[in-house]
Structure formats: structure tokens, C-alpha cells
Amino acid sequence: TRRLHQMQETPPPVDRGVLMLYNTGALKDPNTYNSILHIADVKPYLRKTEYLIPLDYAYPVYGWGVKFNNNKFVSIVSSEDSSVADNEYIRYERPTFAEILEVKNLVEANFGKPASGNILYHLDKKQLENYAHNEIDKILAY
């Protein structure tokens, strides 16, 4: 697996890889818009280049809450079991279909189509319910 910041490095000695397009932002920064996926965090790493090994792309289809107390990171929480005390708040994050598609289009324009397919991460029925079937199909298409 590769992260965006590793794309300028020499690839490891493997036959193929997966570019992880999630957890792109600063989770613990209270000013972060969405630490799971945000186009502003992805764009600086996109430079038209050919990577030396075939890559597939993994896109996020999950969400979570990031709890802060007095603007200091406390924990990652699920939306079902999250409560807040005084001076606490939760930043809920989930990439929209439009955000995922925008990143997908930019990644493919810069690094090419995936070698054998796209990957959805985190493949969970409850998380997938946040996206329509045709949206999932468009994310997976290559």
C-alpha cells in the first residue's frame, strides 16, 4: 500500500500496489475540514507522472466523529455512541460521493486508470448505506 506522500519515492520491490486515498488530512487539527478525504489535501500530491508499478486505488466510503475538548483532540467516535461534555464537540466526517468522484477523476488524470480496479474502504453494509447503488458503481468503474 502507498500513501500520497510516498508517490515521489521509489516503489518497493513488489509486482503491484494500492494507493490509499483516505486519511488524507490532519485528524487532530480542529481546523481540518475532513481528515478522511478532502480535495485540498490531495491536490498537492498530484503531478502527472508514471509510477513504476501498477496501482489500484482505494477510496473511503466510511465516516466517523472526531471528538475535541477545548480544541484538543480526544478520540475518534462513532455517531451512535457519542456524547459530549462541557467544552467538547464532535466534528463528523464522511466524504460525499461528489468529493470521492472529484478525487477519483484527478487521481486518474495524473496517475492513469487503475491496473485492475478500484477498492472501497471500509466495506461495511451500514457505511455503504450512505451511498446510492449507482454512486458505488461509479466509484468502482474504471
Predicted regions and their residues:
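Substrate-binding cleft of secreted/luminal carbohydrate-active enzymes
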Residues: D56, Y62-W64, N69-Y142
